[in-house]
């Protein structure tokens, strides 16, 4: 068999399909019931209007909810369709990771994508139909990243427009994608220092969209999801401390994926206080070290 790009892509797609396809016939679990089966808003004839123009949903992820609504119209309360869509989007994401890794000329780009495709931390997302917001948001974020890189390489303004639209779509699926403009700013500050200021100006609309999405999500989290009581127990300083600790916690899960669970103990007052400054300081040192290393290599 000739080992060309098409073959590599098919093998990568099939690998993700094989690893996560065995349990595709499973029932709804955890929030699937709340998000799909028992979600009266999802079943309403005016669901699309409600998702985009009201605050009735659990959170303001209008594109995610709209995609879920389309699936409800297609296969109703049957879990198979939702799990299949989630799996196919994940397989597509693996191909995008490969494409981006090649664009960045990373060594062993295909193996990087293969690791992403089969990594155990994806089990939660692929087992939980309601977690389509992860796979869809990653898809649009990866497309935005790819298009922005294309724009910076070719000065193609259509690619810039595509990148911005895809970023808005990613935010409309899950707000955790607000990190993209920060990542892009850091990436080009290290790799294209001469053009860093111009690129930062181009990223201003991305930062504005991320800020708006973040403020909206904070309101929904406090008034719809019920996070207000938890947030009220943490001071601003404790939240900063917890953020530094959370980075290392999830990095540990990525490097050593053991004792994984769909839900971890929240960052409550007592645990936030126990983190101290060390995790945040180590994170800052790591970022500075990466910047210096990039400058030295560049």
What are these regions (language model features)?
Residues 1-298:
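Polytopic membrane enzymes that build or remodel cell-surface glycoconjugates and lipids
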């Amino acid at each position: 068999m000739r080992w060309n790009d098409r073959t590599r892509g098919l093998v990568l797609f099939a690998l993700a399909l094989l690893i996560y396809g065995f349990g595709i016939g499973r029932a709804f679990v955890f929030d699937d019931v709340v998000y799909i089966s028992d979600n009266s808003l999802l079943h309403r004839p005016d669901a699309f209007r409600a998702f985009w123009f009201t605050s009735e949903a659990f959170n303001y992820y209008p594109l995610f909810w709209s995609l879920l609504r389309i699936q409800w119209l297609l296969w109703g309360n049957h879990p198979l369709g939702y799990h299949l869509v989630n799996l196919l989007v994940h397989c597509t994401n693996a191909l995008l990771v490969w494409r981006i890794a090649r664009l960045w000329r990373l060594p062993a780009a295909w193996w990087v994508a293969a690791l992403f495709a089969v990594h155990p931390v994806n089990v939660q997302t692929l087992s939980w139909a309601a977690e389509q917001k992860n796979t869809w948001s990653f898809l649009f974020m990866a497309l935005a990243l790819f298009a922005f890189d294309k724009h910076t390489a070719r000065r193609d303004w259509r690619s810039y427009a595509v990148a911005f639209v895809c970023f808005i779509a990613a935010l409309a699926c899950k707000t955790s994608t607000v990190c993209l403009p920060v990542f892009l700013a850091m990436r080009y500050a290290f790799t294209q220092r001469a053009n860093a200021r111009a690129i930062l100006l181009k990223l201003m609309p991305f930062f504005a969209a991320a800020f708006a999405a973040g403020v909206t999500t904070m309101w929904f989290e406090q008034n719809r999801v019920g996070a207000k009581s938890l947030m009220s127990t943490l001071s601003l300083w404790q939240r900063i401390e917890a953020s530094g600790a959370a980075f290392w916690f999830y990095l540990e899960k990525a490097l050593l994926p053991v004792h994984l669970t769909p839900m971890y103990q929240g960052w409550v007052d007592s645990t936030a206080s126990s983190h101290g400054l060390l995790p945040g300081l180590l994170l800052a040192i790591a970022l500075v070290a990466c910047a210096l290393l990039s400058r030295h290599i560049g």
